[in-house]
Amino acid sequence: MANRAPRGDEADYVVVGSGSSGAAIAGRLAESGASVIVLEAGKSDEKLLVKKPGLVGPMHAVPQLKKPFDWGYYSVPQKHVLDRRMPVPRGKVVGGSSSINGMVYVRGNRANFDSWAAEGNKGWDADSVNAAYKRMEDFEDGESEFRGAGGPIRVTRNKLPQEGTLQFIQATADAIGCEILDDYNAESQEGVSRMQQNAADGLRYSASRGYIHHLAPATLQVQSGVLAKKVLIENGRAVGVEVVDATGSRRTLRAGKEVILSAGFVGSAQLLMLSGIGHAEHLKEHGIDVLADLPVGDNLHDHMFHALTFHVSSSKNKGTPPYFARGLVKELMRPGTSFLAHSVFEAVAFLKTSQAAEVPDLQLHLLPWAYVTPNQDAPIRHDVDKRPALTVLTTLIYPKSRGTLRLASADPTAAPLIDFQYLSDPADLEVLGEGSEMVREIFASGAFNGSIKEELHPGKGLRGQELRDAILNRATSVYHGVGTCRMGVDELAVVGPDLKVRGIEGLRVCDASIMPSITGGNTNAPAIMIGELGARLVLSEPDGGAETCQGN
């Protein structure tokens, strides 16, 4: 097949969103020879704050630094957590959220995907998903039964773990009785390990770096600074996308084959509803003609964490900034040699809060400094103690609570109403409470050699209901929203296992919004995998990669 670049504003495929899934599916489709236009509302990812892994800390701690790369969403007041409005960072930049996240690389538990398949989602079982992961990975240990090599996304371990990090790993094994894992992304996830990251050689390996910049297929065109207003649907078929660019000019991009939405759990659901696909009554409330009555925006869920911070005596464990400035100078002079060449997270554990659990229901992220999450009185302020410290983000990875995403208006520039309904199911609070007590057991271990001085937050005297109250005051999101365009074979599904939107031809959704249920761990790697597997689904169509773009 002859490769041919997009002609003007027309291509075989128009992909909305250049994030984790969008970059992956667009890169693979273009690699096959198909012409692809990717629409991105944000600007270039070739910025120091984006490229240097360790700068993700100050980026998220200082709102002014993050603002150029973030949609800046907030949830509606969350009535089960003291009516707090939670920040919902979403990448508004080439690479999407993969350009501003913590670069933690977690595939998820194999049982997650077998569960999807058991619900009727053929082709999404653990073995099928493993094949997609292997295609996308370039793991530092090389290829094996469960890991890939030579793919677009480089995956490495943190090479500069601090003393407290190594003590934490041993303490977790001692206190919980779990295994110290060499690779939690292989056959078994349960245990404690050094963190894996999609970063290498001092650079963030976002989806855009791997699939757009490095693959660089000639038939791929990225249009940045372009906001998608709605999908253009004619006679029940998606034929293009109406957009407005940075100058305010409005135009339509035509798709000869398919329109693919990869705008994430917020953007894809919002765009479907603006295009007439969603709950009929809700669309009518906003004066939108109904083209397909589907449960768009339902099934919203997310990972939530509660941070515990401990003051340590070790002089080898860093405090918080100003050491960022020193590290930045070293990193600029000798790339890849300072802690700024790595993710801010250094260790991870996947544990069971109950032996009755079939898979680990708790994830611990270790930060080598003090970090206290925002409280209800200061929703965007990060309180940071300057003393050497270790912080554990005690994370609920299988929430039972479910929320919704709805339109605030028919204006595509208006932020939607994001209601996670955090902790609406009491079982979620109990897991966070049990997990917090487990973290205390870990930090009481002799493996720390007496270096733990005190519990800075929430405070060792807090137990029972007082601890639960502290969790309600401080628990917040890990920014892993999923599920608003649920994949399935029943009436609660928005897309089928082929990612095609029910009732509309030529339209797919390919991102974390399609997850029937959230994966066990950080969701960036699964989102990239969804793009990788989604490309195979598109190309498996009889004329999936054939050129249909018209033009002279």
Regions found by a protein language model. Name each.
Residues 1-552:
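N-terminal redox-cofactor-binding region of secreted/periplasmic oxidoreductases
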